[in-house]
A protein has these predicted regions:
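Ubiquitin-like/PB1-type beta-grasp interaction modules and other compact soluble beta-rich domains
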Residues: 1-70
Length: 71
Protein backbone atom coordinates (compact mmCIF):
# COMPACT_ATOMS: atom_id res chain seq x y z
CA UNK A 1 0.00 0.00 0.00
CA UNK A 2 1.44 3.36 -1.02
CA UNK A 3 2.03 6.02 1.59
CA UNK A 4 -0.49 8.83 1.58
CA UNK A 5 0.81 12.07 0.12
CA UNK A 6 -0.09 15.70 0.60
CA UNK A 7 0.66 18.86 -1.32
CA UNK A 8 1.82 22.11 0.22
CA UNK A 9 2.91 25.40 -1.27
CA UNK A 10 6.61 25.81 -0.51
CA UNK A 11 7.97 29.26 -1.31
CA UNK A 12 5.20 29.64 -3.88
CA UNK A 13 5.73 26.26 -5.58
CA UNK A 14 3.68 23.08 -5.27
CA UNK A 15 5.59 20.47 -3.24
CA UNK A 16 4.54 16.89 -2.42
CA UNK A 17 5.31 15.27 0.95
CA UNK A 18 4.27 12.20 2.93
CA UNK A 19 1.26 12.78 5.19
CA UNK A 20 2.24 13.76 8.72
CA UNK A 21 5.55 15.43 7.76
CA UNK A 22 6.82 17.92 10.34
CA UNK A 23 8.56 21.22 9.73
CA UNK A 24 11.81 19.62 11.00
CA UNK A 25 11.46 16.73 8.52
CA UNK A 26 10.78 19.17 5.68
CA UNK A 27 13.93 21.13 6.55
CA UNK A 28 15.95 17.90 6.61
CA UNK A 29 14.51 16.96 3.19
CA UNK A 30 15.65 20.37 1.90
CA UNK A 31 19.15 19.94 3.42
CA UNK A 32 18.47 22.87 5.73
CA UNK A 33 18.48 21.02 9.06
CA UNK A 34 20.65 22.82 11.60
CA UNK A 35 20.92 25.96 9.48
CA UNK A 36 19.67 29.38 10.44
CA UNK A 37 16.25 29.55 8.81
CA UNK A 38 12.95 31.27 9.39
CA UNK A 39 9.82 29.23 8.73
CA UNK A 40 6.42 30.77 8.14
CA UNK A 41 3.41 28.45 8.13
CA UNK A 42 0.13 29.94 6.92
CA UNK A 43 1.39 33.46 7.75
CA UNK A 44 2.58 32.53 11.27
CA UNK A 45 6.25 32.21 12.22
CA UNK A 46 7.13 28.76 13.60
CA UNK A 47 9.79 29.07 16.34
CA UNK A 48 12.77 26.73 15.98
CA UNK A 49 11.77 25.08 19.27
CA UNK A 50 8.50 23.97 17.63
CA UNK A 51 9.85 22.65 14.30
CA UNK A 52 9.82 19.00 15.44
CA UNK A 53 6.31 19.26 16.90
CA UNK A 54 4.63 21.19 14.07
CA UNK A 55 2.91 18.88 11.60
CA UNK A 56 2.19 20.08 8.09
CA UNK A 57 -1.21 19.56 6.47
CA UNK A 58 -2.42 19.27 2.91
CA UNK A 59 -2.78 22.74 1.40
CA UNK A 60 -0.51 24.52 3.89
CA UNK A 61 1.48 27.52 2.70
CA UNK A 62 5.09 27.36 3.88
CA UNK A 63 7.81 29.94 3.35
CA UNK A 64 11.38 29.03 4.28
CA UNK A 65 14.03 31.73 4.29
CA UNK A 66 17.63 30.97 5.17
CA UNK A 67 20.30 33.46 6.12
CA UNK A 68 23.21 33.83 3.75
CA UNK A 69 26.39 35.40 5.04
CA UNK A 70 27.96 38.20 3.12
CA UNK A 71 29.85 41.30 3.57
Amino acid sequence: MAALRMRIQLNGESFELPDGETVAALLARLDLAGRRVAVELNLDIVPRSQHADTTLNDGDNVEVVHAIGGG
